[in-house]
């Protein structure tokens, strides 16, 4: 299929050129930008619906504001693809999320038009406030605009930032992109007229004069005057909550109508007051019928056919780890009505959508609020329930204080299923699950597990369900399982006990997580080179299986620990035990294979693991290096 024809977009490769276009050309430019976006994502995959919803808003922002001098911060960044196309990156846009290509999120090192990197939600207002205050301190005059979705506004951090911005009376513009909850839908021409009126210079100068007069009144009359003005505007336009936080509220307005957007943005740009919140209502997937009809299915997409909207998904050889978790938890919940499930706005991503279909009264989606999710789970556990608080590894970082203070110190039996453990590929370093083993295994009394395959995951779900002595976690990766046979229900694992998968005599490979398959492949290659190799599945990073580690250390010349996590995790705990137990005193050759001490850019997971030395070849090379020998070529192909 040929690429769309885009004569106006071709003339506007950067915002300076866009600002030279007459306003009458902008609707056509938006249409061309939308067509380009659909064509791009159909070939690369990625986040489509959010970007389609902000096409007109993106065009309007870059037309009205002097970027990059003025700062635009996109919360999360899923919606930033149109922004990338308009800011000098169109020639590389078809490398999106590919190895060596453009990031799927905003990234400071990628463009001067990306003043702040993003990928986790609800950070834009805090970052924008910092930039606004920095501008004031430096004596510079610039506009700072934070664009945040209504979903991100469910996180407490956004309100913390707004409260601070209101107290500072900072010159900050927040655009609330309301594309899902429809907090207050626009009501046509009257809504647009009122929004334009209250954002204009005349109204605001009169308002400012009234405020100066009010300052001469007794305080109780000042408060009454302020409240009267706020509620009068709120009667027509809404926004009382934001006014209470110290923001001047404008909206709601139609985010797809440039005739409404442009004058309001200009009014706000030209005022000296702040902070201001502009409430813009948009539609996810706008302008592409399949995405409009099923916004949830077009949030993140694989490559797809533009005509039909059908996504191309390679056939799976095994069910996904996420699905195995969801179905396993359903099975356990049938045996125990105290089991409840908690997600922080990721029901389908964590597999809890399946659980919710069977047990809707026992499923809780708390929104983008990981801190609350963890302490909410702690409260449930304190009353005898068995909460499974399912959060991606990267997002669990957001609730770590609650894990320590509210769960671990009180030794409450909260279960933490940790999805997206290890490298996640196209989403890059912001979404990699690198650190959970390290930050959880450091906590006294915390049980930390990792599944080596889908059957082990099923066992760990049951083990967690029946473990009541304290907090417990189990991690598993994105993607499909390896195709092992699955029991109908998991087995109960002995806490702190691993397993020997293959017996050998010379080399021992101790795996924590799904690198077990690579360890087995490495053992085949080592065996072909005359090095008999034991392969063990640790299962637990805490408590460690001391007996297993002693056996591996005493009966082998080389011990290699392999994990899909950062330095400071499983291997570090094993090394400390080896040293404390005196097992390093007899000449044991030890190597620890972890993720590198850097943030790996996005790419294909297999290639990223190979780069990290965590594939078969990397493991084999580590063994030969420990022995002081050159690796020999394998007699078989990968």
Swiss-Prot record:
Homodimer. The gene is dxs. The keyword Transferase applies. The keyword Magnesium applies. This is 1-deoxy-D-xylulose-5-phosphate synthase. Its cofactor is Mg(2+); thiamine diphosphate. It comes from Brucella anthropi (strain ATCC 49188 / DSM 6882 / CCUG 24695 / JCM 21032 / LMG 3331 / NBRC 15819 / NCTC 12168 / Alc 37). GO terms for molecular function: 1-deoxy-D-xylulose-5-phosphate synthase activity; magnesium ion binding; thiamine pyrophosphate binding. Thiamine diphosphate binds at residues 78, 119-121, 151-152, 179, 288, 370.
């Amino acid at each position: 299929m040929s690429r769309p024809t885009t004569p106006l977009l071709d003339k506007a490769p950067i915002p300076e050129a866009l600002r030279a276009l007459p306003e009458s050309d902008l609707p056509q430019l938006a249409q061309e930008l939308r067509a380009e976006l659909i064509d791009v994502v159909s070939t690369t995959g990625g986040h489509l619906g959010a970007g389609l919803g902000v096409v007109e808003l993106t065009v309007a922002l870059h037309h009205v504001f002097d970027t990059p001098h003025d700062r635009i911060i996109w919360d999360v960044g899923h919606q930033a693809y149109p922004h990338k196309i308009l800011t000098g990156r169109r020639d590389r846009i078809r490398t999106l999320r590919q190895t060596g290509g453009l990031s799927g999120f905003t990234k400071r090192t990628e463009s001067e038009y990306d003043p702040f990197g993003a990928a986790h939600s609800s950070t834009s207002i805090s970052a924008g406030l910092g930039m606004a205050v920095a501008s004031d301190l430096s004596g510079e005059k610039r506009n700072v605009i934070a664009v945040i979705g209504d979903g991100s506004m469910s996180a407490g951090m956004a309100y913390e930032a707004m409260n601070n911005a209101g107290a500072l009376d900072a010159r900050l513009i927040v655009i609330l992109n309301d594309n899902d909850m429809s907090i207050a839908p626009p009501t046509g021409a009257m809504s647009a007229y009122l929004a334009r009126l209250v954002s204009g210079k005349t109204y605001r100068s009169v308002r400012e004069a009234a405020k100066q007069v009010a300052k001469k009144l007794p305080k109780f009359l000042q408060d009454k005057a302020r409240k009267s003005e706020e509620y009068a505007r709120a009667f027509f336009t809404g926004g009382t909550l934001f006014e209470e936080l110290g923001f001047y509220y404008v909206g709601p307005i139609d985010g797809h109508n440039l005739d409404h957007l442009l004058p309001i943005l200009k009014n706000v740009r030209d005022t000296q007051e702040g902070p201001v919140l502009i409430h813009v209502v948009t539609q996810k997937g706008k302008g592409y019928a399949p995405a409009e009809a099923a916004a949830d299915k077009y949030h993140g997409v694989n490559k797809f056919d533009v005509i039909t909207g059908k996504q191309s998904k390679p056939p799976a050889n095994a069910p996904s780890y996420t699905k195995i978790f969801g179905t396993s938890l359903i099975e356990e919940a049938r045996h125990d009505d105290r089991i409840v499930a908690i997600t922080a706005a990721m029901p389908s991503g964590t597999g809890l959508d399946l659980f919710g279909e069977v047990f809707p009264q026992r499923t809780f989606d708390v929104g983008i609020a990981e801190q609350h999710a963890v302490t909410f789970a702690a409260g449930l556990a304190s009353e005898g329930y068995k909460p499974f608080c399912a959060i991606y590894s990267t997002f669990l970082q957001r609730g770590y204080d609650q894990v320590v203070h509210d769960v671990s110190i009180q030794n409450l039996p909260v279960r933490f299923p940790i999805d997206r453990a290890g490298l996640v590929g196209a989403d890059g370093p912001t979404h990699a699950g690198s650190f959970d083993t390290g930050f959880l295994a450091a906590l006294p009394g915390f049980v930390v597990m990792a599944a080596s395959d889908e059957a082990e995951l099923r066992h760990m779900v049951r083990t967690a369900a029946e473990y009541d002595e304290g907090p417990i976690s189990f991690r598993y990766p994105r993607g499909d399982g390896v195709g092992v046979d699955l029991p109908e229900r998991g087995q109960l694992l002995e806490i702190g006990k691993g397993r020997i998968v293959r017996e050998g005599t010379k080399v021992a490979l101790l795996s924590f997580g799904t690198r077990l398959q690579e360890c087995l492949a490495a053992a085949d290659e080592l065996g072909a080179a005359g090095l008999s190799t034991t392969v063990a599945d640790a299962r637990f990073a805490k408590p460690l299986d001391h007996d297993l580690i002693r056996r591996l250390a005493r009966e082998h010349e080389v011990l290699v620990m392999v994990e899909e996590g950062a330095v400071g995790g499983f291997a570090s705990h094993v090394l400390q035990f080896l040293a404390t137990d005196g097992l390093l005193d007899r000449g044991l050759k030890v190597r620890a294979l972890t993720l590198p001490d850097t943030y790996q850019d996005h790419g294909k997971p297999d290639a990223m693991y190979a780069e990290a030395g965590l594939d078969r070849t990397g493991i084999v090379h580590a063994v030969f290096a420990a022995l002081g020998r050159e690796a020999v070529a394998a007699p078989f192909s990968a």
